[in-house]
Amino acid sequence: GGSFLLNCEWTTLEALEKELPAKMKNILAKKHANLYVIDAIKIAGQLGLRGKTSTILQSAFFCINRQIMPYESENPDDKNTAVALMKYMAYKSFSRKGDAIVQMNYNAIDSAKENLVKIEIPASWATTKEGAPMVKLADNDYFKNVVAPILALEGDKLPSSAFNADGSVPTGTTKYEKRGVAVLVPEWNIDKCIQCTQCSFVCPHATIRPYLVADGTAVPEDFKTKPALQAKGYSFRIQVSPLDCMGCGVCADVCPVNQKAAADAAKTGAKVDPAARALNMVPLEKLVAKEAANWEYAQTLADAPKDVTAKFADVKKSQFSQPLFEFSGACAGCGETPYVKVLTQLFGDRMIIANATGCSSIYGGSSPTCPYTVNKEGHGPAWANSLFEDNAEYGYGMNLAYKARRNALKDKVAALAEKWSNYAEGKATCEAWIENMDDAEGSKTAAAQLVKCLESCKDCGCECDELVKEIYKEKDCLVKKSF
């Protein structure tokens, strides 16, 4: 007999029959719930409060639950109703922002009653097996065996043996969730895009990215591209992941083309023509099938050469580097995560993070998924968080330990260079690593060459075997880390 309020665009029984999962229908019917729906997202947009649904939903809650307190009164002087108290709090909270903002919130409170729809639950829902189908889980053992049960609120059923004894968890698991929570997602207008990559730069969730496709590459029919600026021999595309997008609209807001279109329209008082914009926020259903497939294809594209995408050259080029922080659980439009994302684009393949407890520990390390991921070589950030609010000391200790390990490793590599006096290539490789060990890019090249030499020698049976194996065991320290 309880009441269930659902914020969705499906405000008819017919729509709910199609969109609700069978299990949810079964539970609602068996519990004899009073089902109410309201499209708070649409209402908020109409009122100029895009994405701000809490006031509408709170008003709807009190409208449904009048046994808690009177919802409204015919007496305008009655201050003890839900509507009067909510409006009082709206004025108290927003009056410093101006009368227009206060009135928007008043309108949001008043809109709930007139837009609330009660759905009579049919008896057939108690046993039905019809409804929205379950999404197929990603083909990843850890996600299927550990993450999915936790997301389904069945984590208590997992044995302790399902987890690593040291508490570490695999990275790069948010990409398997594909939550599809956005109501509106950006649609790329290929004709208007100026290829500035600002949309990617500001995206808090790394769900919209630029891609370069080498000329002559066979691409799917729907994967439209245009000649790339400043990248001869390549075509350009902006691709969104509709099922990972949070629908915040920051990309569309920052787009210079969109801003110009808005300014031009303002001069005449006309509405902005969608055709004049490079990014338009459109319903998820319009794009999801086509763009989800395009996103999956984009992940198979080869990385563009570094001379084309020199990530330290400028902001635009930095966005062609793979973000190693993606699809976090941060709030839609988060202002922190774009910085974290860009850091991983610049330094992520050698990053070690001593995290400070706060939002960054929630969107960065919430169980059961991890937004930090790896590149195609398997390199990415290592992340840890201390709950003692001592991340400076925590990170300092990591750095001291790392330096001690590297200094010891340097001595071992120097000793190996002496032992390899008759192995010219190996000796030169050891010396090259020692010379470049404190240079970020130089140590990458030298480390890769040294590992090849170590792998060719570690089981050859010579007197260097033990030393080679010791160095190889600590190959994670060969590339200079960024703390």
PLM regions: where:
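Short conserved micro-motifs at the rims of enzyme active sites and ligand-binding pockets
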Residues: 16-17, 47-49, 249-251, 365-367
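Active-site cofactor/cluster-binding pocket
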Residues: 1-148, 218-222
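Ferredoxin-type iron-sulfur electron-transfer modules and their immediate structural context
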Residues: 86, 90, 95-245, 252-482
